[in-house]
Amino acid sequence: MVQMKKCTTKEDVLEAVKERDVKFIRTQFTDTLGIIKSWAIPAEQLEEAFENGVMFDGSSIQGFTRIEESDMKLALDPSTFRILPWRPATGAVARILGDVYLPDGNPFKGDPRYVLKTAIKEAEKMGFSMNVGPELEFFLFKLDANGNPTTELTDQGGYFDFAPLDRAQDVRRDIDYALEHMGFQIEASHHEVAPSQHEIDFRFGDVLCTADNVVTFKYVVKSIAYHKGYYASFMPKPLFGVNGSGMHSNQSLFKDGKNVFYDPDTPTKLSQDAMYYIGGLLKHIREFTAVTNPVVNSYKRLVPGYEAPVYISWSAQNRSSLIRIPATRGNGTRIELRCPDPACNPYLAFALMLRAGLEGIKNKIDPGEPTNVNIFHLSDKEREERGIRSLPADLKEAIDEMKGSKFVKEALGEHVFSHYLCAKEMEWDEYKAVVHPWELSRYLSML
């Protein structure tokens, strides 16, 4: 499978469509919650779509507009054009992302990609560019006879296991091939800690490209898995008693080609700006946990005992901390935020991480001393004495923190902020009204 030539202009895309016999192009964007929205246009309509955009009804999209002001258009981004390698080569199908605009030609402020681009502009004003390297984990489950997803395991493998314990290595290989064909640089692919859990790591990149890649990654993983008879789930905690799936986010700032976080003259080899960036993340993380960990199920992962963070602290190597500093230095110096999960909208999550870090640098926010002990072994009193706070315990607590946050409101903009909170409050209200199997198991026979 040969990696396709990267397109940067409309002309590049039109030439590739002709050379590769592409018949349909799936135009895509995400709603406020990060769910992909897509519709196909025939290749003959592509040039006009580049010229005039693709019109759609925004009132039918989560978090967009009311029915009386619903006309919107998608402006295609040629740099995101990719041919889908699992589709037939003859009469091929491609995918392209875009930016959402209003009919008057102004960007739609409710577009998650716009929110991230606005944060990027703030960084550029300070002379910075942001790189991100996410680590996405997922489960592969069996399908039932009707092709619907189950939670039936595909194997009993563990961390770094291989065949026969890892029964999905061929599926991962096919996913790797497809991603590489679509321009990803795959760095590692392996079985994770939990049964049927997997991780595929791709090389870091600039923050907008990486957010696009997260959207593409989930789309590719789900598509290939389904073609192979599996269901790929990015649900944070689909199974009780085993590790959940995270999206650890490694991040760094660059200026004039140099890593801003690296300083060879300090004991930790971390710059003062790196420390302030950490301080900004620690200060604001509770306010935007509802975005990095966006669903009710997210908080079943953020509990002690399963390698997920619970407490707000930082450390050089301590994996019980929220923020870890991997050992690599030089241009590889980075900060790893460990709470995000793959259910998040990457555009919004990365925008908030960047904004929080920038505010830390602007306001010289001190992160305090690193916590180099296992935080889970500390008593409540010891954590209190060290000033270690906890992440929100559930989605309701996260929503309440976000509602009172001037920082998050300014970072997301009024439209996204209000629509996102409305959607999350509805989700929580629906959840709390449902009678869960645990309640029946616990109480039915005794009460």
Curated annotation (Swiss-Prot):
<keyword id="KW-0547">Nucleotide-binding</keyword>
<keyword id="KW-0963">Cytoplasm</keyword>
<dbReference type="Pfam" id="PF03951">
    <property type="entry name" value="Gln-synt_N"/>
</dbReference>
<keyword id="KW-0460">Magnesium</keyword>
<dbReference type="GO" id="GO:0046872">
    <property type="term" value="F:metal ion binding"/>
</dbReference>
<feature type="binding site">
    <location>
        <position position="137"/>
    </location>
    <ligand>
        <name>Mg(2+) 2</name>
    </ligand>
</feature>
<dbReference type="InterPro" id="IPR014746">
    <property type="entry name" value="Gln_synth/guanido_kin_cat_dom"/>
</dbReference>
<dbReference type="GO" id="GO:0005737">
    <property type="term" value="C:cytoplasm"/>
</dbReference>
<dbReference type="GO" id="GO:0006542">
    <property type="term" value="P:glutamine biosynthetic process"/>
</dbReference>
<feature type="binding site">
    <location>
        <position position="338"/>
    </location>
    <ligand>
        <name>L-glutamate</name>
    </ligand>
</feature>
<dbReference type="InterPro" id="IPR027303">
    <property type="entry name" value="Gln_synth_gly_rich_site"/>
</dbReference>
<dbReference type="GO" id="GO:0004356">
    <property type="term" value="F:glutamine synthetase activity"/>
</dbReference>
<feature type="binding site">
    <location>
        <position position="187"/>
    </location>
    <ligand>
        <name>ATP</name>
    </ligand>
</feature>
<comment type="subunit">
    <text>Homohexamer. Interacts and forms stable complexes with the regulatory protein GlnK1.</text>
</comment>
<dbReference type="InterPro" id="IPR008147">
    <property type="entry name" value="Gln_synt_N"/>
</dbReference>
<feature type="binding site">
    <location>
        <position position="192"/>
    </location>
    <ligand>
        <name>Mg(2+) 2</name>
    </ligand>
</feature>
<feature type="binding site">
    <location>
        <position position="319"/>
    </location>
    <ligand>
        <name>ATP</name>
    </ligand>
</feature>
<feature type="binding site">
    <location>
        <position position="307"/>
    </location>
    <ligand>
        <name>L-glutamate</name>
    </ligand>
</feature>
<keyword id="KW-0067">ATP-binding</keyword>
<keyword id="KW-0436">Ligase</keyword>
<feature type="binding site">
    <location>
        <position position="336"/>
    </location>
    <ligand>
        <name>Mg(2+) 1</name>
    </ligand>
</feature>
<feature type="domain" description="GS beta-grasp">
    <location>
        <begin position="20"/>
        <end position="105"/>
    </location>
</feature>
<comment type="function">
    <text>Probably involved in nitrogen metabolism via ammonium assimilation. Catalyzes the ATP-dependent biosynthesis of glutamine from glutamate and ammonia.</text>
</comment>
<feature type="binding site">
    <location>
        <position position="319"/>
    </location>
    <ligand>
        <name>L-glutamate</name>
    </ligand>
</feature>
<feature type="domain" description="GS catalytic">
    <location>
        <begin position="112"/>
        <end position="447"/>
    </location>
</feature>
<feature type="binding site">
    <location>
        <position position="324"/>
    </location>
    <ligand>
        <name>ATP</name>
    </ligand>
</feature>
<feature type="binding site">
    <location>
        <begin position="243"/>
        <end position="244"/>
    </location>
    <ligand>
        <name>L-glutamate</name>
    </ligand>
</feature>
<comment type="similarity">
    <text>Belongs to the glutamine synthetase family.</text>
</comment>
<feature type="binding site">
    <location>
        <position position="199"/>
    </location>
    <ligand>
        <name>Mg(2+) 2</name>
    </ligand>
</feature>
<dbReference type="InterPro" id="IPR027302">
    <property type="entry name" value="Gln_synth_N_conserv_site"/>
</dbReference>
<dbReference type="Pfam" id="PF00120">
    <property type="entry name" value="Gln-synt_C"/>
</dbReference>
<feature type="binding site">
    <location>
        <position position="135"/>
    </location>
    <ligand>
        <name>Mg(2+) 1</name>
    </ligand>
</feature>
<dbReference type="GO" id="GO:0005524">
    <property type="term" value="F:ATP binding"/>
</dbReference>
<protein>
    <recommendedName>
        <fullName>Glutamine synthetase</fullName>
        <ecNumber>6.3.1.2</ecNumber>
    </recommendedName>
</protein>
<dbReference type="InterPro" id="IPR004809">
    <property type="entry name" value="Gln_synth_I"/>
</dbReference>
<dbReference type="InterPro" id="IPR008146">
    <property type="entry name" value="Gln_synth_cat_dom"/>
</dbReference>
<feature type="binding site">
    <location>
        <position position="248"/>
    </location>
    <ligand>
        <name>Mg(2+) 1</name>
    </ligand>
</feature>
<feature type="binding site">
    <location>
        <position position="301"/>
    </location>
    <ligand>
        <name>L-glutamate</name>
    </ligand>
</feature>
<dbReference type="InterPro" id="IPR036651">
    <property type="entry name" value="Gln_synt_N_sf"/>
</dbReference>
<feature type="binding site">
    <location>
        <position position="252"/>
    </location>
    <ligand>
        <name>ATP</name>
    </ligand>
</feature>
<feature type="binding site">
    <location>
        <position position="244"/>
    </location>
    <ligand>
        <name>L-glutamate</name>
    </ligand>
</feature>
<keyword id="KW-0479">Metal-binding</keyword>
